[in-house]
Swiss-Prot record:
Keywords: DNA damage, DNA recombination, DNA repair. InterPro entries: ARFGAP/RecO (IPR037278), DNA_rep/recomb_RecO_N (IPR022572), NA-bd_OB-fold (IPR012340), RecO (IPR003717), RecO_C (IPR042242). SUPFAM superfamilies: ArfGap/RecO-like zinc finger (SSF57863), Nucleic acid-binding proteins (SSF50249). This is DNA repair protein RecO.
Length: 248
């Protein structure tokens, strides 16, 4: 059976001397993998469509196991991302998180649209770190994780938030922050932005400017929470941390 899908390449794996296994997150089927025979050959008709982060239409011969990529038509190569090491690093984090967080052939058009919109914004020049924070926040419910972003994790009141508790699974107010000695102190902006990112429609994203110190706190909150409850190891996250460390 042949299936035509619109999708974005989120992973490629070399297979033999000339082939690739291409993993595509599609609007119609969710995540699907297919053998792209001869894709490593420079003159192959599949060489360009099998590049990481390529957005296109793909014709796949489906089977009980791994499908076969027959042909593809490029919608966008995301060249702005490919030509910039910082954009490549953040986009790689986004597509790897998508890959690790999803199962094969689980239809999720909402997630496809979120992935596409995030990469599209990145190509348009929106802060890639902010986009990665938004994406990481919005992936929480996809992974079945629902931290307390709206109320204190202990008293469930909407009040002043001064810390984030991984143990309690959310923000803590000033009255209950002392109950977790390992809490992460945060500023008011961290709570407001994480709450906003969790709920708002990504299509409505306008001009966004976030202080470096706030982004650093948000990253710490999200990474610590993911480490505790998700168990996903991302190579791209390590590279991002190295970029930040050496300020390349």
């Amino acid at each position: 059976m042949f299936q035509k899908v619109e999708g974005i390449v989120i992973r490629t794996t070399d297979y033999g001397e000339t082939n690739k296994i291409v993993t595509i997150f599609s609007r119609e089927l969710g995540k699907v993998s297919a053998m792209a025979r001869g894709a490593k050959k420079p003159k192959s008709r599949l060489a360009s469509v099998s590049q990481l982060m390529t957005h296109g239409h793909f014709l796949i011969q489906m089977g009980s196991g791994l499908g076969t990529l027959q042909q593809g038509e490029i919608i966008s190569t995301m060249k702005e991302i490919r030509e910039d090491i910082f954009l490549t690093a953040y986009a790689s984090f986004i597509v790897e998180l998508t890959d690790k967080a999803t199962e094969d052939k689980k239809h999720n058009p909402y997630l496809f649209e979120m992935l596409y919109q995030t990469l599209h914004y990145m190509c348009e020049g929106v802060d890639p770190e902010v986009l990665s924070l938004i994406y990481q926040t919005k992936m929480l419910p996809v992974l079945g994780m629902r931290p307390y972003f709206d109320t204190c994790a202990i008293c469930h009141q909407e009040t002043d938030f001064v810390a984030f508790s991984v143990r309690e699974g959310g923000f803590l107010c000033s009255r209950h922050a002392e109950q977790d000695q390992y809490r992460i102190p945060v500023g008011e902006a961290v709570h407001k932005l994480l709450r906003l990112f969790y709920h708002f429609d990504l299509h409505r994203l306008g001009n966004v400017s976030v202080k470096d110190s706030t982004k650093k706190q948000m990253r710490l909150v999200l990474n610590t929470y993911y480490d505790e409850y998700c168990g996903i190891y991302l190579k791209s996250r390590r590279f991002l941390e190295q970029l930040d460390k050496f300020q390349i």
